[in-house]
Amino acid sequence: MKRVFIAIVALFALVGESFAFIPFGHQTIAALAEKYMTNKAKSEVQTILKENMTDESVWLNSLRNQEATAYTKDWHFFTLDVNGKSTTAAENDGVVQLEKAIAVLRNRVNESDSLVSASLRTVIHLVGDMHCLSHIRIDGNEATKGFDYMVTNEGVGKNHKSWKASWYYLWERTFVGRYTFFTPQYYADDIDIYANSKKSAYEQGTPRSWVENGGEDVVRALPHLHTTELIPTQVIQLYEFNHTKCMAKAGYRLAALLNDVFK
């Protein structure tokens, strides 16, 4: 278990500014989680991180750009089998690394401080990643590895415009980008207002069932987006509701997980 984190621990003190990969989205998920964490969990997290949890939510992204830890790039993706089930035992799969990091936290009294710190940062980040639909891949479905599509404003004559968009950009930046002039806490509050009535239902389950749940969303969305036809902007906007739901699930589930680990 320790082997998979050894390079991370070795570089821990060397990592500086995180490279941007929807940092605001991860920070918002962490901010939402903090709203529902117990005082004990918050205290434990603060003691381990010695930094703000919201800021540290993007730490794992910086490792994939370090030569010694470039292998962690694959950890950000989650694979389902052809039946949409999370059965993988692959060492480089996100859900496997998440489970390993959770195990370290549960056994933290017997682990080094560096390993526990790296594991907590890994948990915070990967719970966010698994709720980004472009990070879920389904065996036998090449479209889940990413694709481009064309969008139109449906204007007439000179007012008509069309442009290329991508599956990755849709889930990672399109909707989050509208809120980046606010604070993560403000965006988290906005998401909470929208989704709080379903919080109890959303926070149930395990990391593997959460990925499977996301896979169901992927399967529903693909037929409408993986097409050679022009897609009206109105259709794209409808997916903001789905995106907000995914963000809410991530925040609520992260809080529930950390509350359980640090109970």
Regions picked out by a protein language model, each given a short descriptive name:
Residues 19-126, 133, 138-263:
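N-terminal, motif-rich segments that launch catalysis or mediate targeting to/interaction with membranes
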Residues 1-4:
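Positively charged n-region of N-terminal signal peptides that target proteins for export
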Residues 11-12:
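Repetitive helical segments and hydrophobic/amphipathic motifs
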